[in-house]
Amino acid sequence: MIKKEEVEKIAGLAYLKLSDEERETFTRQLGDILDYVEKLNELDTDGVVPTAYTVPMKNVLRDDKVGSSIPREEALDNAPDKKDGLFRVPSIIGE
């Protein structure tokens, strides 16, 4: 069973602030997940060939083709913030 302290550490590593209710919920949910993984570890997989894909692989991507798109002004009509004909978005990287 996972401890509340371990959930707090995981939340800290993910930069998450959890309420007491969320901490309780995640402690229970992570405990359930770890219990399920433990059950999976009990499966006899002798003779089962390891594989990364369960279905045959084939290239499902299409060739890149240049096509028409909507005019810039029309795209910017939907933008909550714009400047000099460009989308304006919040900075996510510090200077």
Swiss-Prot record:
Top-tier EC class: ligase
Disulfide bridge map: none
A biological process term (GO) from this entry: regulation of translational fidelity
Record keywords, A-Z: ATP-binding, Ligase, Nucleotide-binding, Protein biosynthesis
Any coiled-coil regions, as ranges: none
Stored Pfam families: GatC (PF02686)
Protein family according to the UniProt entry: Belongs to the GatC family.
Functional summary from the UniProt entry: Allows the formation of correctly charged Asn-tRNA(Asn) or Gln-tRNA(Gln) through the transamidation of misacylated Asp-tRNA(Asn) or Glu-tRNA(Gln) in organisms which lack either or both of asparaginyl-tRNA or glutaminyl-tRNA synthetases. The reaction takes place in the presence of glutamine and ATP through an activated phospho-Asp-tRNA(Asn) or phospho-Glu-tRNA(Gln).
Name of the protein in its database record: Aspartyl/glutamyl-tRNA(Asn/Gln) amidotransferase subunit C
